[in-house]
C-alpha cells in the first residue's frame, strides 16, 4: 500500500488507485497521474551492480527472464527510466539454468509451532575490492568484476551444505571445501565460478566419486572458528557405505582435483588394531595377495569393492536379487581358503535347495577343490558328520545342523575362520544364525562373518537386531537406483492393476454378513467388540479384542458362563475371518472350500453351539446353495483378479510366440512366468484355471514341505526337480507360495505376477527380484481397492525409507570391536585378478554329500571344547578375586583322652543324712499357718490307671521324662502276682548253666581249648543249609523236671516267657500285701547282666563239631 502525498498518519486514507487492477484504463490513468517517487538506484556506465538481479514474482515460480537485447553500454533514456518499474535478470553466461525442484529439506526438521526463520539470509554489503585486471572467462561474457554476486552464491551454497551436514549427523565429508575451497578469497578462481554455474544434469557432469565417497579418502574439513562452533559428537557411530551420491541444492559436489579418481576399483587394507595374534595357521606367502576371479568375464566394480571390504571386516551385503551375492561370497571363501592352512569355512543357508545351488556356484567360480568340500544336512548320520569334520575344510550346511554339531562337540569352533550367512535378514531373535555366532564367540575370537541378503529388514529395530546378532561392523547396500549397478540391472516395467468386487462376490458378502451379524451384535452388546460390519473382521483384530476384554474389569469380574460364551463367539468368528479374506482377495472357490471344512466340523455331535447356529442359519444355507453349482462349473472364475491373470498370461505367451515352434520343441519354452500367491488354496485354483490352456500354458504348483488338510507338501527333492524342469522349459509357469520368494535360483523369469499384496517390504522385494536379471522383465501387481492397495503403498514406502536409513548409517550401532583383523599387522594384501583353474573333479554333477553306508560309524562321545586360557579343574572362590592369600598354619589337633568310667557312689553318699532330712522338712516341707500343713512326696501308687497313660495337654506337650515315667509305670503294672515262682525258676536255670559250662570247658575238643592252643579266634559258626548235612553233630540234652534245654533257650527268651501278660487282672498296688515277700530275691537288672555275660558262650555251645585234626 502506498502512502498519500500529505503527511497524514491515518492509514485508512489511501488513494483509490491502490485497488485498481493493472492493465485497465483506470490503471493507466492512475499510473500517469501518480506522483509517488519511484525506486532509484545509482548505476555506473556500462556496469550492472549485483542488485540488478531481481526475481519475477508474477507467477509464483523462480523463472529466469530472457536477457534484454539492448546493449549494456547504451545510454538509457530519461523517459524509459521514469516509466521502468521492474528490472530483469541479465545472466553473465550463455547457458541457461533449468528449473530445480527440491524434494527434501536442507535443515533438520523442527516442530510446527516453532518459527523457522529464513533458510539463508543475504549478507550485508561489503566494501568493493579493486577490479582484477586479467580475469576474463570468455569473450562473450562480461568482465569478472561481479565477484560479489559469486560470493553471495557461494555463501548460500555453504549455508546449504552446513544445514545438510547437520541434518545427517555431521559425519558427511564436507563438500563445501571441494566446491568452494577459498571462500575468504577476494576473487574466486574461474574454475570455481564455472563449476558454480554448471547446472544441467548430464551424466558427464556426475563426479567420479559419486559412488566411492569413503571417509578415509575425503580431504580434511576446513572450518573456521568464526563461522562454526565446536564439533558435536554424534550419538551413534556412523558407518556410511559406499555407492551413495551426495550433492547440494545446486548439484555442487565437485571432486577435488588433488584426489585420484575413486570411481571403479578401490584399494583397501585391513584395519590397524591392537589385538593378539590369531591362533589359525596362516600361509605366509599367500596372505600378501588376494585373488579376484575373472572367470565370468567383465569385472564389476561394486563386486570388486565389496569383496575387498568383506575380507577385512564383518560385512553385511544388501544387494538386489541377481546381482552376484554368491560370486562375492565365493571370492571371499577362496581367499580365506588360500590364506589359512587348516582352518574351516562354513556356508549356511536356511534350506537344503538354497545350500545346493550355492555349491555349484562356488565350484565353478572359486575353484575350491571338491575333495575338500562337503554338504551336511540333518539326513547324514552323526558318525558320518564327525568324519567329515575331521577331514574337510569347506562346509555347506543348514544352520540347525551346525548348531547341533557345535553343541555335541563334533565340530571344533576354534577351527572356523569364516562364516557366510545367506538370507541374513532371518538372523533375529533366537534363530539358528544367532545361536551359531554366539557359540563361536565363546570359543573363538578370530573369525570373519559375511552376511548376504536382498532386504536387511522392514524396521529399524529388525535391522539393528541383524547387526547385533551377527556382529556386523560394516554395511554395503545397493538399491536398483544406485548408479554403479544400473548398467547391470535391466528395466522392469511394473504395472499395478486394481479391481472392484464382482457381482457374485457382493452377493456372497451380503449373505455372509447376515449370517455373522447376530454374533457380532452379541459381542457389541457386551462391549467386547466395537465393529459393526462383519466383513471387516480379521483374525488379528478379534484376538486383540478378546485380550482387551479379558483384561478389562468386565472380563475379570464376569462369571464362568459369560466368559465361556465370549470365548466361543470369538473363536468361531476368528475361524471365519480367514474365509472373509479368501473371499475378498483370493476368490470364491477357496472361500467355498473353507466353508465346507467349517461345515464338516459340525457333523453329528461335533462343533459348539455357535458353530451349529451359523451352519443352521438360513442365510448360510442359501449361500452354500449358490456356491455349490458355481464351483462345479469348470468355466467359472470366482474373482476378477483371476480373470485378468488369465488374460495377462495368455497375452504374454502369444506375444512371445509360444507354441509356434516345431512339434519337437513345443515342450521347451523361451519365456517363463512366475506367479506368487499367499495360500495353497489360491495356488491350486490358479493352476486349475491355467491348465485349461495347455500346452500353451504349462503351469505347476510350488509349495513348501509341510502338509496341510487337503494339500500335501513337497519335499526338498521334489522342489529341486521342479526348479530344474522350470529352467529347462518343461514348465513355463510356476505358481509359488512364499517358498519361491527367498533365494532359490529359478532361472530367468520374464513376467512376475503378484496375485496378492504383501504388507512386508522384504517379501515384496524378494518377489520382484525374480525378474530383470539378464533381460528386461515385467511385474504385474493385482490389488483390490481398499486395504490391499493401501498395504502395497505402505510396504513400498517403508522399503524406500528403510533403504535411506540403512544407507545413512546414523540410526544404527555397528560392532567394530568384534570384527578382528586376523591377518598379521603390517600385511596389506594386493589384488590379483586372474583366471581361476577349475579342477576336473569340480565338473561332477552330483552334490558332494557323504555317501550313506550300510552300517554308519558309531557316534563319537561328546567332546567339551574349552576357550583359550581357561583353567580346568576346580578353583577356590578365594582365587577368583586375584588376590594371593597365604595359607594359615594348621594347628595339630589335641588328642582327646579316652573316657574312663566313673565309679558309682555308695548309697550312703547319695541319701540325705538325718540332719539334712530334718532341714529339708523344716525349710521346704512345712508351711506355717494356723493349722499345720506338710508337703508330701508324690505317691506313685495313687491313681495308677491315670498315671500309666499320658494326660491331655493344651499348650505344652509332655516332656521326655514324663514319657519315660509313663513307660516305666506301664511295665510295672504288667508284673504278675506269681513273680516269686518265676524268679526261682530263673535262678535254677542259672545254676544249671554254670555246671554245663564247666563240663564243656573240660572236654578236649571244645572250641575254647582249640582257640587257646592255636592262638587264634574260633571260627564263626555257620548255619547249615537245607541241603547240607552236619558232620558228627552231637546235641547234648539235659533232663530235668521242667524238660528245659539250656542250649536252645536263652535267658532273654525265658524272661520274655516269664514276662508275658496273663489274662487275670493284676491287683492294685494298694491291695498288695508285703508279708509274702520275705525272701531277698535279686533284682531284674542283675539277672540280665549275668545272662548277657554268658550270651556268646551259650551260642557256641549249641552244636559241637568233631575236630578232624584230633583223629
Swiss-Prot record:
Record-annotated membrane-spanning stretches: none
Biased composition (Acidic residues): 1-18, 47-65
UniProt motif (DEAH box) ranges: 422-425
Positions with a binding annotation for ATP: 319-326
One GO term of the biological process aspect: double-strand break repair via synthesis-dependent strand annealing
PANTHER family hit by this protein: FANCONI ANEMIA GROUP M FANCM FAMILY MEMBER, FANCONI ANEMIA GROUP M PROTEIN
Full protein name: ATP-dependent DNA helicase mph1
Native species: Neosartorya fischeri (strain ATCC 1020 / DSM 3700 / CBS 544.65 / FGSC A1164 / JCM 1740 / NRRL 181 / WB 181) (Aspergillus fischerianus)
Amino acid at each position: 500500500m502506498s502512502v498519500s502525498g500529505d503527511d497524514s498518519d491515518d492509514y485508512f486514507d489511501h488513494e483509490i488507485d491502490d485497488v485498481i487492477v493493472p492493465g485497465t484504463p483506470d490503471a493507466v490513468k492512475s499510473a500517469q497521474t501518480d506522483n509517488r517517487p519511484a525506486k532509484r538506484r545509482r548505476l555506473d556506465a556500462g556496469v550492472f551492480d549485483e542488485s540488478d538481479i531481481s526475481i519475477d514474482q508474477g507467477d509464483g515460480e523462480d523463472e529466469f527472464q530472457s536477457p534484454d537485447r539492448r546493449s549494456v553500454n547504451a545510454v538509457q533514456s530519461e523517459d524509459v527510466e521514469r516509466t521502468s518499474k521492474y528490472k530483469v535478470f541479465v545472466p553473465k553466461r550463455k547457458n541457461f539454468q533449468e528449473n530445480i525442484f527440491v524434494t527434501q529439506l536442507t535443515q533438520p526438521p523442527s516442530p510446527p509451532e516453532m518459527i523457522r526463520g529464513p533458510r539463508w539470509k543475504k549478507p550485508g554489503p561489503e566494501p568493493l575490492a579493486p577490479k582484477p585486471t586479467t580475469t576474463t572467462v570468455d569473450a562473450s561474457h562480461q568482465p569478472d568484476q561481479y565477484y560479489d554476486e559469486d560470493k553471495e552464491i557461494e555463501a548460500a551454497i555453504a549455508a546449504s551444505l552446513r544445514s545438510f551436514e547437520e541434518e545427517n549427523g555431521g559425519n558427511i565429508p564436507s563438500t563445501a571445501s571441494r566446491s568452494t575451497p577459498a571462500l575468504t578469497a577476494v576473487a574466486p578462481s574461474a574454475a570455481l565460478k564455472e563449476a558454480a554455474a554448471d547446472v544441467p544434469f548430464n551424466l558427464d557432469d556426475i563426479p567420479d566419486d559419486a559412488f566411492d565417497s569413503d571417509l578415509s579418502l575425503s580431504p580434511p574439513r576446513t572450518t573456521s572458528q568464526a563461522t562454526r562452533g565446536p564439533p558435536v559428537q554424534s550419538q551413534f557411530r556412523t558407518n556410511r557405505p559406499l555407492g551413495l551420491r551426495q550433492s547440494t541444492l545446486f548439484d555442487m559436489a565437485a571432486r577435488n582435483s588433488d584426489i585420484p579418481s575413486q570411481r571403479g576399483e578401490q584399494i583397501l587394507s585391513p584395519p590397524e588394531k591392537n589385538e593378539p595374534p590369531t591362533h589359525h595357521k596362516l600361509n605366509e606367502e599367500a596372505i600378501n595377495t588376494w585373488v579376484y576371479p575373472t572367470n565370468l568375464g567383465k569385472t564389476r566394480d561394486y563386486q570388486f569393492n565389496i569383496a575387498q571390504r568383506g575380507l577385512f571386516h564383518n560385512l553385511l551385503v544388501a544387494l538386489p536379487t541377481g546381482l552376484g551375492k554368491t560370486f562375492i561370497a565365493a571370492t571371499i571363501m577362496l581367499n580365506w581358503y588360500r590364506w589359512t592352512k587348516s582352518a574351516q569355512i562354513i556356508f549356511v543357508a536356511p534350506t537344503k535347495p538354497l545350500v545346493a545351488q550355492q555349491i555349484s556356484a562356488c565350484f565353478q567360480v572359486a575353484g575350491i577343490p571338491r575333495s575338500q568340500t562337503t554338504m551336511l544336512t540333518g539326513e547324514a548320520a552323526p558318525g558320518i558328520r564327525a568324519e567329515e569334520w575331521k577331514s574337510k575344510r569347506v562346509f555347506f550346511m543348514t544352520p540347525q545342523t551346525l548348531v547341533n554339531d557345535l553343541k555335541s562337540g563334533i565340530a571344533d569352533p576354534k577351527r572356523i575362520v569364516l562364516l557366510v550367512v545367506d538370507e541374513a535378514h532371518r538372523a533375529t531373535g533366537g534363530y539358528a544364525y544367532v545361536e551359531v555366532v554366539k557359540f563361536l564367540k565363546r570359543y573363538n575370537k578370530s573369525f570373519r562373518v559375511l552376511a548376504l541378503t536382498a532386504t536387511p529388514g522392514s524396521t529399524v529395530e529388525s535391522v539393528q537386531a541383524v547387526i547385533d546378532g551377527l556382529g556386523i561392523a560394516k554395511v554395503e547396500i545397493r538399491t536398483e537406483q544406485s548408479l554403479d549397478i544400473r548398467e547391470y540391472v535391466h528395466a522392469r516395467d511394473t504395472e499395478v492393476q486394481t479391481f472392484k468386487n464382482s457381482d457374485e462376490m457382493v452377493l456372497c458378502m451380503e449373505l455372509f454378513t447376515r449370517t455373522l451379524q447376530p454374533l457380532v451384535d452379541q459381542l457389541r452388546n457386551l462391549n467386547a467388540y466395537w465393529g459393526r460390519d462383519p466383513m471387516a473382521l480379521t483374525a488379528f483384530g478379534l484376538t486383540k479384542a478378546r485380550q482387551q476384554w479379558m483384561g478389562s474389569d468386565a472380563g475379570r469380574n464376569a462369571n464362568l458362563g459369560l466368559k465361556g460364551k465370549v470365548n466361543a463367539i470369538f473363536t468361531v468368528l476368528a475361524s471365519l475371518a480367514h474365509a472373509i479374506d479368501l473371499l475378498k482377495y483370493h476368490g470364491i472357490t477357496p472361500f467355498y472350500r473353507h466353508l465346507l471344512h467349517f461345515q464338516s466340523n459340525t457333523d453329528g455331535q461335533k462343533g459348539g453351539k455357535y458353530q451349529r447356529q451359523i451352519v443352521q442359519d438360513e442365510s448360510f444355507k442359501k449361500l452354500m446353495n449358490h456356491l455349490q453349482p458355481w464351483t462345479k462349473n469348470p468355466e467359472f472364475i470366482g474373482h476378477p483378479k483371476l480373470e485378468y491373470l488369465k488374460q495377462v498370461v495368455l497375452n504374454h505367451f502369444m506375444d512371445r510366440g509360444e507354441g509356434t515352434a516345431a512339434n519337437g520343441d513345443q515342450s521347451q519354452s523361451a519365456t517363463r512366468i512366475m506367479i506368487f500367491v499367499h495360500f495353497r488354496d489360491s495356488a491350486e485354483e490358479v493352476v486349475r484355471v491355467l491348465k485349461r490352456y495347455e500346452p500353451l500354458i504349462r503351469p505347476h504348483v510350488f509349495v513348501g514341505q509341510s502338509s496341510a488338510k487337503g494339500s500335501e507338501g513337497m519335499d526338498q527333492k521334489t522342489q529341486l526337480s521342479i526348479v530344474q524342469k522350470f529352467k529347462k522349459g518343461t514348465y513355463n509357469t510356476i505358481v509359488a507360495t512364499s517358498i519361491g520368494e527367498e533365494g532359490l535360483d529359478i532361472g530367468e523369469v520374464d513376467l512376475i505376477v503378484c496375485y496378492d499384496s504383501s504388507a512386508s517390504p522384504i517379501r515384496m522385494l524378494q518377489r520382484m527380484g525374480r525378474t530383470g536379471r539378464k533381460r528386461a522383465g515385467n511385474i504385474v501387481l493385482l490389488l483390490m481397492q481398499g486395504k490391499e492397495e493401501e498395504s502395497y503403498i505402505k510396504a513400498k514406502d517403508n522399503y524406500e525409507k528403510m533403504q535411506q536409513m540403512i544407507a545413512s548409517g546414523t540410526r544404527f550401532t555397528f560392532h567394530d570391536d568384534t570384527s578382528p583383523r586376523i591377518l598379521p599387522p603390517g600385511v596389506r594384501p594386493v589384488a590379483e585378478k586372474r583366471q581361476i583353474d577349475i579342477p576336473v573333479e569340480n565338473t561332477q554333477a552330483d552334490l558332494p554329500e557323504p555317501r550313506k553306508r550300510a552300517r554308519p560309524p558309531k557316534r563319537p562321545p561328546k567332546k567339551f571344547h574349552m576357550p583359550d586360557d581357561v583353567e580346568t579343574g576346580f578353583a577356590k572362590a578365594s582365587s577368583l578375586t586375584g588376590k594371593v592369600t597365604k595359607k594359615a598354619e594348621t594347628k595339630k589337633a589335641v588328642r582327646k583322652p579316652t573316657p574312663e568310667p566313673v565309679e558309682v557312689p555308695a548309697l550312703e553318699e547319695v541319701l540325705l543324712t538325718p540332719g539334712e532330712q530334718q532341714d529339708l522338712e523344716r525349710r521346704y516341707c512345712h508351711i506355717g499357718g494356723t493349722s499345720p500343713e506338710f508337703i508330701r512326696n508324690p505317691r506313685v501308687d495313687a491313681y495308677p490307671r491315670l498315671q500309666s497313660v499320658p494326660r491331655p495337654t493344651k499348650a505344652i506337650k509332655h516332656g521326655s521324662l514324663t514319657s519315660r515315667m509313663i513307660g516305666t509305670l506301664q511295665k510295672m503294672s504288667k508284673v504278675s502276682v506269681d513273680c516269686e515262682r518265676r524268679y526261682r525258676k530263673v535262678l535254677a536255670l542259672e545254676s544249671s548253666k554254670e555246671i554245663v559250662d564247666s563240663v564243656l570247658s573240660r572236654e578236649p575238643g571244645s572250641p575254647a581249648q582249640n582257640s587257646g592252643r592255636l592262638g587264634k579266634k574260633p571260627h564263626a559258626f555257620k548255619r547249615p543249609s537245607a541241603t547240607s548235612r552236619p558232620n558228627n553233630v552231637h546235641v547234648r540234652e539235659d533232663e530235668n523236671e521242667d524238660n528245659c534245654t539250656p542250649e536252645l533257650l536263652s535267658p532273654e527268651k525265658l524272661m520274655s516267657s516269664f514276662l508275658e501278660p496273663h489274662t487275670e487282672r493284676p491287683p492294685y498296688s494298694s491291695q498288695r500285701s508285703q508279708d509274702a515277700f520275705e525272701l531277698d530275691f535279686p533284682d531284674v537288672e542283675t539277672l540280665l547282666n549275668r545272662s548277657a555275660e554268658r550270651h556268646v558262650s551259650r551260642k557256641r555251645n549249641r552244636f559241637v563239631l568233631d575236630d578232624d585234626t584230633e583223629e
